[in-house]
Amino acid sequence: MRFWYFSAILWVVCQALPSKKQYSVAPELLPGLSEIEDKSTIPEMYAGHMPLAQSNSDDKDEIDYFFWKFSRPDKVLNTLIIWLNGGPGCSSMDGALVENGPFRVNKDLKLVVNEGSWHTRADMLYVDQPVNTGFSVSNSKEKKYDEDLTLTTQHFMDFLESYFKVFPDDQFKDLIIAGESYSGQYVPFLAEAIQKRNAETSDDLAKYNLRGILVGNGWMDPDTQSLAYLPFALSKGLIDQNNPHFSTLLRQQEKCQDRIISRNPNEHQPFQYEECENILQSILTATRDVSADTPSNQVCMNIYSYNLRDSYPACGSNWPDEVLHVPGFFDRPGILEALNLDPSKVPQWKECNLEVYYHLKNRKAVPSVRKLPALLDSGLKVILYNGEMDLLCNERGVLDMIDKLQWGGAKGFSSKTKEYDWNYRDFETNTDHIAGNVLHDRNLTYISVHNASHMVPNDKSLYSRGVVDIYLDDIFLEELHGKDVLVTTSEKDMDDFDNSKLGVLGITDGKPSEEEELEEEFDQYVDELEEGESESGLLDDDKEDETVGATDQNDDKNKGGEDKPNENPDKEKEEQDRQRKRRKGTFKIFGITILVVLTLGSFVFYIYIRKHTNKTRAILIDPSRRQHDSQNKRVSWADDLEHGYDFETDQSQPRSGQSAPKKNGSYTRVPNTELDESFELENL
């Protein structure tokens, strides 16, 4: 009996999750960080293996997902962004160290600051998944791989359950699921699973505060994306009808179309068709430069940024250069230990695991595009952004996908779609740069990023952070050449600006803050006063002065001629508005002054009374026999009140959803030294 008792205790101890402190990462252990002069740019970090909660009865293997979290050390932010790279099978450390994380790895295998890091806007959580991606492992003797997105989704939900137990404060933050390329599949599946979990959870405090999803250059609709390759290549001049391979391309396009049209809607369909996958291969073959004087590294078009060239058959796998530094960084002595990993239990890091790709064939799951209408109809905020130079997941395919979507009572972008130009403002040089264009309709926002690749955060990091600013509504709205322009900036902290958020794109809920509500009530009060004074004739003098001033101006303009009627009623209306605002400002200052005087007077009167009044004491209770009140209390918070304990658990976190602009006048796949690790180029 005693044996079983101690065995049970041992089992419970072994199942216990590590503490938050055990996941802490010391910056001094990471090469390069000690050389950074501005220590405020170094984030607070947590990393390590997170055991997955075993909710799936068919999956008894213990799985550990590797995560790396970054947050600002100087400020508590109320938003958590979970970033996933795609592949499938590509590590999210691409995102952390090559794209939108706080650091990049230089050629000396040291960390340097990434000026466009997203962690200045929200806490960033990078997770390697599915199992056997990056540093995420299973303890089974034989390696097991996820074969369907439904299982991948369940595993990630198990990760979240464990993660929020270790980091409970994060569960109450606004949650955004983000990723790029093949993560266009992961992200909607996860969003749907979270919404389902919330619907089945009666306790509001146990729900996850999912607010939106961000997908960059997403592979969401395989059929539509495949059919967009040839039209996109033609529109960009990458190929023309005089190309000797053009007839072959047309036949390949027809095969793909016929395959899609002929499918039986009553039967389960393949996740994607081989006939459609082959179109991209045919385009690369047709555009290959085989002339003798062409350098070997310029033979093939880079599918991730079509304005660049690469060797064949790499066609982009040797790009970007920074990714080649990451394996060497993780191989440095002490790095794994600094990230709370046991070197004996993790494989050598490689960017993408092709085995994960081979196994995740999705024989049951449907493409994530079918999840989008329900997610949008639920009110979830959805942002899709695309680098315009990407061929693999090009913007033509994404826009065609949106045109087919039915949500919010309409199909695709409607006549009410708002269109904006988008500029990035560098305050250091006081210059604006064209960043792209924005389309917004209902709760869907599409952002085209100017001159950016498949990996927008890599080559346009500051622009990519603007995508987060647009979601958070930390933007300016200006008018330029008669068009509305959204402006994002280089500033680390947008709270430095008086940016009252009203939700110009409807991205945020547009709820005013308490201060804004009070100001609105005061404005209404002033308006009522003005109306009352106007009716009683109290403002006649002001009106008379305005009339006299206007008459004098007309006299000056019309000297030597007859009086003319007002030719610009708009200017007259603007002048009336300015007069009204001045009067309102006067009333507001007067009202505030009265409130301040009354408050100070009440305080002084209270002090005077307290000082000159004798203290009272209870006459019905003998003080010597009085018992402590707490002995008779039946609720715990009574003692807390008596001892002055504060019930506000986290006052430092900002309120969410208060946002509006000021008016101022997959990739997942990055290059690898091993060609066969690029899932997109498998058939090459």
UniProtKB/Swiss-Prot annotation:
Compositional bias segments (type: Acidic residues): 514-547, 674-684
Location(s) in or outside the cell: Golgi apparatus, trans-Golgi network membrane
Protein name: Pheromone-processing carboxypeptidase KEX1
Lumenal side: 17-588
Root EC class: hydrolase
Bias (Basic and acidic residues) ranges: 554-578
This protein's record includes keyword Isomerase: no
Membrane spanning stretches: 589-609
Renumbered residue ranges of the record's region Disordered: 498-582, 641-684
Glycosylation sites per record: 443, 451
Cytoplasmic side: 610-684
Bias kind Polar residues: ranges: 650-671
Bilayer disposition of the protein: Single-pass type I membrane protein
UniProt KW Hydrolase keyword: yes
GO CC term, one of those recorded: membrane
One Pfam family this sequence matches: Peptidase_S10
Keyword annotations of the record: Apoptosis, Carboxypeptidase, Glycoprotein, Golgi apparatus, Hydrolase, Membrane, Protease, Signal, Transmembrane, Transmembrane helix
